[in-house]
Amino acid sequence: MDNITFKIFNSTAALPLQWDHVAQQNVFLQTAYLSVLERSAPINMQCFYIGIFENSELIGVSLAQYLNLNILESFGERDKRFKTIIRNYIFKNFASHTLFLGNNMITGQNGYIFSKEIDFECISEILRKSADEIIGYFKQQGIAIHLVSFKDFYENCASAFKNQAFSKVYEFKTQPNMVFELPASWQTKEDYYTAFSTLLP
């Protein structure tokens, strides 16, 4: 790992020219997608783009996202019950500043990609160190990161990471339910479109 380094970028305009060559196997890490994400990101999200270098050659790219959940309206003003006030206080002070290494907007292994084989020890160390650097960036701004999530690894990657720099990281698994049951009344795609423009009773 001595000759492996990383650099964190705050803007897609600053990304190295070789970025898309490295990310050619993952459209969600290419500059076209990242530029759209940067321009259309929710107001509570900030993206960081991590270039991973061997000597001076770009060999890997990764995405990190900071979410400030205090800005979400759903956690804003609600009723004034004591339980709600306590919950909001705890949330605001202990869980509202979240850093994702990976893409919080989509599911799947879209957090990083390499143009060459890199061992899991090196990858896990780079991800941990880049998270630490981003946490330090926010600390300088007076923002404490409450939660760090390393998101969406393949099963074999997650297992290998647990044996490396992620050995003390709490692991949880969830799989979105992609099952969508169609009402019997939908016989054509027009029925589907109509359902979106029809008011429910």
Report each predicted region and the residues it spans.
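N-acyltransferase acceptor-side catalytic subdomain
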Residues: 1-201
